[in-house]
Amino acid sequence: MKKPQTQLRRLLEQLPCQSFVCGKQAYYYIENGLDRALAMPACVFLAGFDQLMLGYEKLDSLYLPREHLRGIFNRAGIVFPALLVEGAVAGRWKEEKKAIAVTLFGSLSARQKKAVLRGAEACWNKPVEWMAL
């Protein structure tokens, strides 16, 4: 929305909005009554060009740490399938013939790796092949 901040603030005040600050950025939402702890699984395999990745300014994403930006968005415009672990992009994935190839951007705890393994098994009934970055 290309409107002055004062005008946007007045509009937000008319809505039943809640807000929170992450870093130095304020985010607004309308409560939907869902229990957030139940709403998102520990591991989510997002598709390439998923709206969760495209719906935010890349540099301001709540889900994609800035240091992993090029691991998901390449300079040619490709958006790789992202692996979300506990609400943050932890790597990317690709379905291969016999396994799900997972490339991590950092380390995961044993509990987090188990969530990835369970997620791949539930979605594809295939094992995970851990790839180097």
Predicted regions mapped to residue ranges:
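Long, charged, low-complexity, helical-prone intrinsically disordered regions
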Residues: 1-133
